[in-house]
Amino acid sequence: MKHKSGFVSIIGYPNAGKSTLVNALVGEKLSIVNAKVQTTRDRILGIYNSENYQIVFSDTPGIIDPKYKLQKKMMSYVMSSFVDSDLVVYVFDSSTNKNIVGKIKDILLELKVPLLIVINKIDLINQQKVEDIMKSLKSDFLDSYLSLIHI
């Protein structure tokens, strides 16, 4: 049987749950999880191995509008992760309702990388708000996403 592998970038705003998701997917505490913003400053790679496949997850810094050199470097890690990806997972924090900025959305659409949208923290909002968010995200990304799930 042929062994398959793929690269998955996890993106989203700070504290959206990206590192928690990566830790859960690889089955160990690889990325630091902290309430402090910008705990993840570099790309952190986590690998999930199976008998027939391997998935390399890239936990990226939270998406921000960079104000100084370190933040610009952190955003370059996010941008470079798109190029290497077979799939981008966008973790959307439903408790803040902040959607990704136009520049990043435009890059995703331009690269035509498949997009999986994960709506996180739905336990903090009501069902109507979940439905409104799903409708808004579907409208924003039209045909560019593979699937939209909530956790």
Regions found by a protein language model. Name each.
Residues 1-67, 72:
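Conserved G1/Walker A P-loop phosphate-binding module
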Residues 21, 150-151:
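Adenylate-forming
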Residues 38-43, 61-84, 94-107:
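Switch II of P-loop NTPase G domains
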Residues 74, 108, 133-137:
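Short, hinge-like loop/turn segments at secondary-structure boundaries
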Residues 84-102, 116-128:
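Conserved Switch II/interswitch segment of TRAFAC-class P-loop GTPases
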Residues 111-114:
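A short helix->loop->beta-strand "cap" motif at the edges of active sites that frequently abuts
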Residues 123-149:
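Canonical P-loop GTPase G-domain recognition
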